[in-house]
Amino acid sequence: SFCLEPKRVGRCKGYFPRFYFDSKTGKCTPFIYGGCGGNGNNFETLHQCRAICRA
């Protein structure tokens, strides 16, 4: 599942507030996404992260 993938901020220099599921804590956590080169563990809202990863 992509919920278990590590957080990836990406290689671009954008500033997009997002959430990822932290498998160590079992919680959805905010981070800043650069805009490209990320992975599936990247959600626009806390609700979306919690719904998909069951946090």
UniProtKB/Swiss-Prot annotation:
Residues 3-53 form the BPTI/Kunitz inhibitor domain. It holds the Pfam family Kunitz_BPTI. The record marks K13, G14 as: Reactive bond for trypsin. GO terms for cellular component: extracellular space; nematocyst. PANTHER family: BPTI_KUNITZ INHIBITOR DOMAIN-CONTAINING PROTEIN (PTHR10083:SF374), KUNITZ-TYPE PROTEASE INHIBITOR-RELATED (PTHR10083). Inhibitor of serine, cysteine, and aspartic proteinases. Does not show effect on crabs. This is PI-stichotoxin-She2b. The lineage of its organism: Eukaryota, Metazoa, Cnidaria, Anthozoa, Hexacorallia.
